[in-house]
Amino acid sequence: MNEVITKPDSTANSGLIAPAREGDYTGILPSRKIKEMLNRNEIKMMINLDHDQVQPASIDLRLGDYAYPVDTSFLPGKGMKVLDKMEQLDDRFTDFGIDLRKGAVLEKGRVYVIPLLESISLRSEVAAFANPKSSTGRLDILTRLIADGATSFDQVGEGYKGELFIEVAPRSFSVVVKTGTRLNQLRFRRTRGVEARSFSAAEWKKLLDEGKIVDSSDHEKNARSIKTGMLPFTVDLEGSGKEGEIIGYRAKKHAKRIDLERRDYDPLNFWEPIRFHKTSSLILDPDEFYILMTKEAIAVPPDYAAEMLPYDTRAGEFRVHYAGFFDPGFGWNAKLNKAGSSRGVLEVRSHEVPFLLEHGQTVGWLRYERMAARPELLYGQDISSNYQGQSLKLAKQFKQL
C-alpha cells in the first residue's frame, strides 16, 4: 500500500499550486503515463499508433472498419455487452454495416454505433472518461463513448477490460469519415494512490489574481464568482465593438457534406456570419447551431487539466459546448508564466424555445483538476495545436475568412 504524503509540495519552481510530481499521485494521467499504458498493453490497438495520437492529457480514439446505423440511442446496462445489446435491438444489424475502409458518408439526423480501434484493460485504481475532439464539436457532431456494461455515456469504470464503441450523430452536416478518423478522445484518472494536494479557496484565488487561469483583466469578476477549482465564463457578443464585425456563426441548412480529411472548405458555403450590432445580444432560435466565443482569455497551466462542464439548465434554455477537454498548456504564455490570449470557443444550440443571449452573460463553467504528473508535452508549445491563441475560429476543415 502506498503511504500518504501530507507534507506540502514546493511551488518555488513554477509559481503554481504544488506542482505535480512523479509517483502514484491521484489525478489526470499525462502523456508519459499514457505511453506507459500502451507499453503494458493496457491500451490495445488493432492497427499501429498514429504518431500524434497521444495528447498532453489524453489519447485520441479512432473509428474502426464498420459503422452500424441504429434506430435509437442506447446504453447496454450492467452485465450486457454493446454488441449483444445491438443484436437484441436488431438481430440483423450486421447486415447493414457501412464499410469505412475507403471512406463513407454518415448522414445528418442519423445515429450510428462504431467499434473503435482501441480497447483498454485498466488497473483497479484507474478510470477513464471521454469527450469529443474540438473539431467534432465545432461541426455539431454528437459523439458519446459506450463501454460494455455501461450505465452512462463517456464513462469507463475502474478496472474495465474490454472493447470501446462510439455513438455518432451528425446534427448540422453530413460528414465523410473513414477507418482511423478521430472523433473523440479519452482521459485517464488515477483515483487512488498518494494524494496530490487539493485546491484551497485561498490558493485558487491566488491563481486567479496572478492571471494564471484567466487574463488578469477578467479576474475581478471571476474572483467575485469564486468556486474553488471552478472558472465561470461568459459569452462575447461585441468583439472589438466595431459595427459589422463577425462575432459568431450560425450553421446553414442544407449545406453539402463535409469530408473530415479536407482543410480547404469555404466557410460561407456552410456558415452564416453573425455580426455585431449595438444591442450586444443574440436571439438563439430553436434547433439552430451557433459558434460563439468566450469574453475571457483563459488558460490551463502545465500542472492542470480542465473540462467544460455539461449543460446546466440554470444557465438558460440552451446547451453550450460539446468538446469539454482543455489540455495542459492551452492558452498558456510560458514566457510570462500566465494566461495568454486564447478564448474558449462555444458550440451553442438552443432547445425548445427562442432564448435571448446577452453580451457578458455567464454560460458555463470550467472545472480544473490536478494532473497526476506534469506532461512532457504541452498544448500549443510542444505539439501542433490547431486552436492555440485562438479567438473566434471554426473547425480546422474550413479556411480562415
Identify the function of each model-found stretch.
Residues 1-401:
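DUTPase catalytic domain/fold
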